[in-house]
Amino acid sequence: MIKKISSTALLFAVIILMQGSCAITNKNPTYKISNQYNVSIDRDFWGIPYIKGNTDQDVAYGIGLVHAEDAYEDLVELMPLYRGQNALYNGLDSIDTDYLVRLLKIHSKVKNIGKQQLSQNILSMAQAYADGVNMYANKHPDNVDLSIHPVTQEDVLAGSYIQHLFFAGLDRDLAQMTSRDETSIPTGSNAIAINSTKTDSNASYLLINSHQPLSGPVGWYELNIESESGWHGHGGNFPGSFLINVGFNKNIGWGATVNRPDVMDIFELTINPDNADQYLLDDKWESFEIEEDKLAFKLFGFLRWSTKQKFRYSKFGPVIEMNGKYFALRHMNQSSFNEIEGWYEISKTRNVYEFEKQLAKRKIPSFNFVTMDSDRNIGYFYNGRIPNRNDALKARQIISSSSSKDIWDERDLV
């Protein structure tokens, strides 16, 4: 997958100044932060922020401020991963994730797909959130890692995209390439809706018990939001997100649990024994599309270096080489950033029926949802962007295929 380089060889290369070295210096960031936002932030007895603004952008800016103030370390912990710079901050052992981010072309997709798919309202909210984080850094430079800043709109969009890949099971699916026979114990979260006819108190209850850590980048952050444009709610999100992912508004509450639908396939390719840059497709040898790029990393805690890597692409998808075998990855949401819009839309619904209508757009690639509205209607929805496959049963495992019939279209859903 990644060209292996010994630490000794790298140190020797530095000493004799071989070609390929790069010098990376830290500079305090210089950037402008908009003063256009009008937001007020109050806190209750428990310290929960109540964020009010004229517009959705004002509220998103406020969310960025409170995330930076209350959960700065959690907020920036995954920022190097989102940028494909994990190894540059955390050392050579972290370079695999940088390779994956580059292989999946996440940053070019943010620019060429995400910014075209998402509404201007959502893009402006993402920018406002980043502005809030950066404003905190600007006012408290001694409390932050200045090398991380400025946090950008692109960081926010890439972070959402990557988080949804992992929640949909990317890490679990990739593990199949090295441990096909291992079976993990199923785990998951809980959400329960009980109508008044089932309770002694004649009250209705919605329980949201998602099994997230109590802290860290995927630990819930509780907040209350209200904009004069009609976006309001109380619930939880993760540091790095400007939306409410679980919670309630004045009319409806909703909980989400990880359901892990089969939204990704891994294809084991047949490689030409006479040319490792070709794979079999419909009884013919097809050449990989090959790109080259540099991955930067830190060595010995202070030395900054880069290595040139090849990135292969097939008709089946981007390709990973592992132990002499070549695997292509195909994900149902590989060309979609609509999950951000999807979370925003469900948070503005007024009843279970509106919630179902928004969820039916299938902008969110996975998750179960349990809901209850103020009229005590309850709903359970198994959600997923599941492709219409040639052989769905075979797709539960790694697929050994050279047939184009197994290459599904991500616009064709079951």
Kindly label every feature range from the protein language model.
Residues 14-18:
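Hydrophobic core
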Residues 21-22:
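N-terminal Sec signal peptide cleavage junction
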Residues 12-13, 398:
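Alpha-helical interaction segments
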Residues 26-414:
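Mature extracytoplasmic enzyme cores
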Residues 10-11, 90:
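Enrichment for repetitive, rod-forming helical segments
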Residues 1-10:
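Bacterial N-terminal signal peptides that target proteins for export
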